[in-house]
Amino acid sequence: WLQGREVWMFSMLYNKVEKRQEWLDCAVQGGEFLKKYGHDGNYNWYFSLDRSGRPLVEPYNIFSYTFATMAFGQLSLATGNQEYADIAKKTFEIILSKVDNPKGKWNKLHPGTRNLKNFALPMILCNLALEIEHLLDPGYLEQTMETCIYEVMNVFYRPELGGIIVENVDMDGNLVDCFEGRQVTPGHAIEAMWFIMDLGKRLDRPELIQQAMLTTLTMLDYGWDKQCGGIYYFMDRNGCPPQQLEWDQKLWWVHIESLISLLKGYQLTGDRKCLEWFEKVHDYTWTHFKDTEYPEWFGYLNRQGEVLLPLKGLFLSPTVPTGSSIFQS
């Protein structure tokens, strides 16, 4: 999970910012480590390893696969190494084969009782398709992009709920009245909208960009804590108490992804509301998440904006969100 994100970051910086040898060296070192230890031999990617490369957690998490694909896709561009390209393509094929059951045999839910489709995979595929565009057949790429756009903007986007995006629906795309079915994750929804804007730009579809920009504004207004400031982590579309104990925490990545989406929205549409919201989120982010004494940012705040955990090097806290935000800006 984490190593894939870091390999992608250093490869992307080398490809798009500056040909700095130290960035390429870091990317190749990480890529070789992942190639040797990161999967089970069939490109099922472990969630975590110990320091020597022994697996700690089985390859249940589909995002380990997506981040490996992104990593080796960018690394293949940086190095011209065909083996890296083949790893990215093979892993992408495995991801698509897992769409209906991302966790596979590690899925702990009982089948048939309450089967739900989750927003996270279609969301990340919107980004992933463009990340490895250079490796895919054009027809295959086009089909994948259209499928992702449909899932995000026609299945999880719900105009009958005021234009918000829900986190789970049933397998037929219907709303479900349960904790999972009522869940709204503002950070996921807002992050997905800058992926959709990128697709709209790539496909020359200004109406898609406009819809994604407006959805960003809707989700920010919906997810913003009117009392304490900041964006909620989890919400319930009916206003019921969410089941997640951390529902009212303020997370660094949610705010950083929001800044990216707002900047893209303003750049691509010129809508002043994006700029106004950007300044509001920017002020909150730099005031609350930045460590004024030492480098790096805090990741987790309570509802009132106070630091919950001073530890910065958590497995969900890579340099990618912050670095990506700076690059996208």
What are these regions (language model features)?
Residues W1-S329:
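Glycan-recognition and catalytic cores of secretory/periplasmic carbohydrate-active enzymes
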